[in-house]
Amino acid sequence: MITDYCPTPPTAKKLKIIYGWYIYTIYAQLVFNIYLAVYNGCVRRPIEAPLISVCHSIFIAFLLYQVVKKRTRFAWVMLAYYILMRLYYANVLHIEFNAWSRGLVFIFLTLLLAGTVAVGQLATPPLRQDWLARLGWRQWATLAALSGLLTPLITADYLS
């Protein structure tokens, strides 16, 4: 009988630390969107912008609630939402991303990728311990390289 390749799983402590930082990342996005809703409501007069920010905040709060319950699909939805919102900010709102903001996008994207992997391993039961789920330095380098590749792609303005 041939057994599947099963690398050593990450320790529970490492998974909980990554999961904690993942939750903090989502909280930071939620607080930022609430700030935008208040800012848009106080400074801008049109009703659309504050309502859009409030809807984004409610959606992120819903995703956070589902991720705290360790539902893997919602972690992937959160990652896709983050990428789509960066494309929206860059292409529809024509927001310029400088080096500092691209660095922040890189850090958030790396934490969201690692958190998505950690949520998959903390879910009951984790079906398979794949190479990426070991979360050693090689896996972190892979996630950072993927984030480094995606960051300029999702922060570039293609429509102007």
Predicted regions and their residues:
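Topology signature of small-to-medium multi-pass alpha-helical membrane proteins
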Residues: 1-160
